[in-house]
Amino acid sequence: GSEMFIRDSVKTVAVLNSWGQQRAWGCHMVHHALYQKQNYSYAGVIEALSGAPFDVKFISFDDIKVDPKVLDSIDVLINVGDGDTAHTGGKVWEDPEISSAVKGFVHRGGGLIGVGEPGGHQYQGRYLQLAAPLGVEKETGFTLNYDKYNWDEHRDHFILADCPDHDVDFGEGKKNIFALEGTEILIQRDKEVQLAAHEYGQGRGVYISGLPYSFVNNRVLYRAILWAAHDEADLHKWFSTNYNVEVHAYVKNGKYCVVNNTYEPQDTTVYTGDGSSFTLHMDANEIKWYNL
């Protein structure tokens, strides 16, 4: 089989939930992935990962409990779903071994992406148990009188660079999320944070309120992973400037292809593995193959 290792050092991304490998890829599907209003803003993350040029793993909280070193081989950890569910962990965050392993992973230089209510569980004065690395918290009524001064948006961020008008469709989004001090808000709506970036020790956290699948959101997650992994410099490798077009490299087979995912003609600039580029016009649904 052809492996899609498109980089010399492909990034490893792990989805963290209560099932891990047991429900790999199926963790946000119900009954043949029928549309659910409560679910599509999370399922989009898994769908985007399925076609992304990363080595994707699914790990459980038990995996971390048995061997915290399981995190050593991972570049970016993703926790996605509603609070107090098996998706995000719920009561598992009361276990200091798991909590410290995940926070320590980020603090030492790892990346973390939280979608929805990551680590959502009311405990020790916090709701989002991943608030420290992600730099955001949910107002559940207990901290109404806390001063919340951080509301400035930074839409010129690396993560939003490919988005029309530097905006994002967050699907159902989330209400009542606010940013802690030192967090960079990328997008907030009516004083509710939808997208934020945060430096935590040597690592980075990205909060996203929801991410239904679309070609634009595909690119948002791709850039968020690169940013969280301190890998922005690698953006222009096997890359299409037009988010409707994708580049897939099969380095071991000496080939790469460029795919127009739409029913309309598209123009793009394609970057190859060494960072060199060329412009390309593509017909509707066209796939072009090239030799390396």
Segments the model singles out, each with a brief description of its role:
Residues 70-77:
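Short acidic/histidine-rich motifs immediately flanking catalytic phosphotransfer sites
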Residues 22-46:
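Glycine- and acidic-residue-enriched helix-capping/strand-helix junction motifs
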Residues 85-292:
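A conserved amphipathic helix/loop scaffold
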Residues 11-27:
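Short beta-strand segments enriched in small/hydrophobic residues
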Residues 1-6:
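Short, small-residue-biased leader/transition segments that mark boundaries at the very start
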Residues 78-79, 114:
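Redox-cofactor binding/interface segments in oxidoreductases and associated redox assembly factors
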Residues 49-68:
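A short, well-structured beta->alpha microelement
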